[in-house]
């Protein structure tokens, strides 16, 4: 399925990762408060003059991954990132108590939101930022708050207050997954979403608030993703939310039946409990491998679970010591995994007769673009803040498995 990987070294621990919805762009948020945005080579541009596709530069080892921009965005760590639905804006949230909206292409800040403080007046650090639509931004925090902001309200020097605040869980929100819009939707944007927090799952509606909270699952729920197009039958409509737990088990939840899980898949069994399933992503249907989920583990591996048979069919290793924090697929079907101080870009397998001489141990890699930390400009402050800066102190992150990761080159075998 994939057999090539490019490794991008980072200057600090990765705390957040986001993939552009329309272009081959990946952004990372670091423990130092830096945000850096990379552009991956586009295979669409690699065509002959007569329109026939040539061997992609991203496959033959001659492509470049370029740093579009890099800046010190937050005084503390950058805990979360998310692109707007059209990819024009990049939202970041940090332990400095700020959410910043910047142009994805340039990194220039256009808006700021002050996160409401905790009850004791301290910073209520963010856990998730998600643009639900062009009008609505969702922000979750350590105190279990879920704030909803109307992005149509013009920027004001006065700190914007959320239009709504909910508390769907007793603990901080660990994941947020939007549900697809209904058939009667006129906007085409989601108005409901699933969250996990502590040992429960909840569904919240844009207008009606928290609709339902599940029974106590007696296990910490860590990650979630929606998948449709599964085989329908009986009471199943072929739509499920997949939830990753802290003990190595995936639970399957039928859409609309949120009281309790209906199936379990053991991904990582170990004596005394499995490994935490930190992040989930749906493998694109275009890759032709059927319905499949990629699971990023706290142990540094990525496992692939085929739906239907509900079992692990393959595994690759992102890093042998650091957990997988970010996982997703870009617009061209490449898997991007992040954790520790590295980001890896995995490519779909290429037939052996397409391979050229530019290989390393049978695996090709990109040439390095302008992504060296040495190329960082002298002004390391936020684009919108030109005043003096104090040195940022990285703050403790909720997730485990932080630290320096290896920077080796790895490949993996086909998934059939």
Swiss-Prot record:
UniProt keyword Nucleus, yes or no: yes
WD repeat segments: 9-48, 73-112, 118-159, 222-263, 319-356
Positions with biased composition (Acidic residues): 371-383
Highest taxon in the source lineage: Eukaryota
Assigned keywords, A-Z: Nucleus, Repeat, WD repeat
UniProt key word Metal-binding: no
Location(s), subcellular: Nucleus, Nucleolus
InterPro entries: WD40/YVTN_repeat-like_dom_sf (IPR015943), WD40_repeat_dom_sf (IPR036322), WDR55_POC1 (IPR050505)
A cellular component annotation (GO) from this entry: nucleolus
Region (Disordered): 39-64, 353-416
Gene3D superfamilies, sorted: YVTN repeat-like/Quinoprotein amine dehydrogenase
Main location per the UniProt record: nucleus
PANTHER family: WD REPEAT-CONTAINING PROTEIN 55
Family per similarity comment: Belongs to the WD repeat WDR55 family.
Protein name: WD repeat-containing protein jip5
Organism placement in taxonomy: Eukaryota, Fungi, Dikarya, Ascomycota, Pezizomycotina
Gene: jip5
